[in-house]
A protein has these predicted regions:
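Helical catalytic core of nucleic-acid polymerases
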Residues: 59, 84-87, 91
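Anion-binding and metal-coordination hotspots
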Residues: 5-6, 73-86, 96-485
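Generic alpha-helical segment signature
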Residues: 12, 25, 38, 58, ...
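Basic, short loop/linker segments at the boundary and entry of helix-turn-helix/winged-helix-like folds
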Residues: 25-67, 72, 369
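Short secondary-structure boundary/capping segments within folded domains
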Residues: 20-23, 54, 210
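Hydrophobic alpha-helical membrane-insertion signals
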Residues: 1-30
């Protein structure tokens, strides 16, 4: 018989409503609550609060709200606060009841300003150390990469600092003071000349021939064992990847308390300075050479590479494919290399000129003052182990960034560099928490499987000595004694 729903009449009071019973045992927030201790933040932010005045929202609750904001990729903090009363799982995670008052959305922005970046950095470091204690981090091999993040600002907010000062009004006094500090010259790069009035820390960046946008850049170090993020760093989008390798190694060693043995990265990190840095630190650099990777493009297409020239250490000269001698001419102090050249009048008459150089001054080569050490590092970067690590990096690092997309990392939630650092620490911490929970569940499943195997083994042994088995053995012995078998 079909049933009909009666007219809904809301109850004035609800009895025996237990939020803990409403949240499933396998809920992600329940797992996070079991694994992570949020009470540490009381000690971290104690000095940022006074002893008088109104009582604030509990710091662990604020941190949990920010995690929910990232975990569920909620569009705004205002929307988060409006949604919390309707989500029983969020209420349970935050320690609220059905009729508790939800704080204003401004609580989160004020907390970020009050706490600063250091608190969120400490939270990320605690999660990394928790992964280390769980045996999920090896720490000896460092995989590093970077990715661009769109700033929360439009290209229309970019202004030219040359013409801006003539049109500034009273509301732009702060920006004018900032421009005076920059001391911009006409020969400076574009990001020193152009600035966004909405987000001054973001830089105009173009990626892979696409459109120029205001962007930041996140640099990330991932451990190969369980893909735990051991270090993360935010810069403006114009910073080269290779310039932060030293800092990434230092952050990784500080967070893991382990020395790096091998660094694996793409060719953007394969600069001479980075190879020599790894040599100085005693670290193996499994990094493709930037020069060799991008060789054969542009003006260098179809030109003899440096390896086609033979170096004679006795005479300190190079010999070109045509047999001509290139002698040492100049020393570049800033780049720390010598320049070797052949006479231009010889290059002009050479039959191999079209394949050797397009310069009217003839072919020139550069040799670093630490070329011997550099050559050994480049040789290490071409061995079989290095090629295998470079191939592993392609999917390991890209997968880490791909997982971040579900948390909205491709676009900045807030403006200014220090707020971007907070967003980056929260996303990286959440990814590590996910790894921690997943491997804990796998460990429990493995233990349960082992226990089940032991029970099945003991059951088989018990069945071997059961009463029915004993009768069968006696019957077989009896028939054999009578000669019936």
């Amino acid at each position: 018989m079909m049933g009909y729903q009666s007219n809904f009449q809301p109850k004035l009071f609800y009895y025996n409503v237990n939020l803990d019973q409403r949240v499933p045992q396998n809920h992600s927030l329940r797992k996070i609550n079991e694994k992570i201790d949020f009470d540490f933040i009381y000690k971290e932010v104690r000095d940022t609060y006074g002893i008088n005045g109104n009582v604030s929202i509990a710091p662990p609750v604020i941190l949990k709200m920010m995690l929910i904001l990232i975990l569920y990729n909620v569009r705004s903090e205002r929307e988060l606060m409006n949604t919390i009363p309707f989500r029983l799982d969020w209420l349970w995670f935050l320690g609220y009841d059905l009729d508790d008052e939800i704080p204003n959305h401004s609580v989160l922005s004020k907390a970020r300003t009050r706490w600063g970046v250091a608190v969120f950095k400490r939270f990320f470091e605690r999660i990394v150390w928790q992964c280390i204690e769980a045996g999920l981090v090896d720490g000896s091999k460092l995989f590093t990469d970077s990715s661009l993040i769109d700033a929360d600002a439009s290209n229309n907010s970019v202004v030219d600092t040359y013409s801006l000062k003539r049109h500034l009004n009273k509301s732009y006094r702060r920006l004018e003071e900032r421009l005076d500090d920059l001391k911009v010259q006409k020969s400076t790069p574009a990001n020193s000349r152009y600035i966004s009035t909405t987000d001054p820390d973001a830089s105009v960046t173009r990626h892979s021939g696409g459109k120029s946008k205001l962007r930041y850049k996140t640099h990330r170090a991932v451990d190969a064992k369980c893909e735990v993020i051991t270090a993360t760093h935010i810069t403006t989008g114009s910073v080269d990847d290779g310039d932060v390798l030293r800092e990434m190694i230092e952050i990784h060693e500080q967070n893991t308390r382990k020395s790096v043995d091998t660094v694996v990265a793409d060719s953007k990190y394969g600069t001479i300075d980075n190879f020599l840095l790894c040599h100085k630190l005693g670290v193996k650099a499994h990094i493709p050479s930037f020069e060799k990777t991008h060789r054969g493009s542009g003006r260098q297409k179809g030109i003899f590479p440096k390896e086609a020239f033979s170096y004679n250490p006795d005479t300190d000269t190079f010999t070109c494919p045509a047999g001509q001698i290139l002698k040492r001419r100049n020393y570049h102090k800033k780049r720390k290399h010598y320049e070797y050249k052949a006479p231009s009048k010889i290059c002009v008459l050479c039959e191999l000129r079209e394949r050797c150089t397009r310069s009217k001054y003839g072919r020139s080569l550069k040799r670093h003052i630490q070329q011997d050490e550099l050559g050994r590092m480049l040789a290490y970067a071409r061995n079989r182990e290095a090629k295998r690590d470079i191939k592993t990096r392609q999917h390991l690092s890209e997968r880490s960034f791909a997982q971040s997309k579900r948390y909205g990392y491709k676009r900045a939630r807030w403006r200014r560099l220090w707020r971007m650092e907070i967003q980056d620490f929260l996303i990286a911490a959440l990814q590590n928490i996910t790894v921690l929970i997943r491997h804990s569940e796998e460990k429990i499943s493995k233990s349960n499987a082992q226990i089940g195997q032991i029970i099945r083994t003991q059951r088989v042994k018990w069945e071997d000595f059961s009463f029915g088995s004993l009768l069968m053995r006696l019957f077989n012995q009896f028939t054999m004694a009578l000669g019936l078998v």
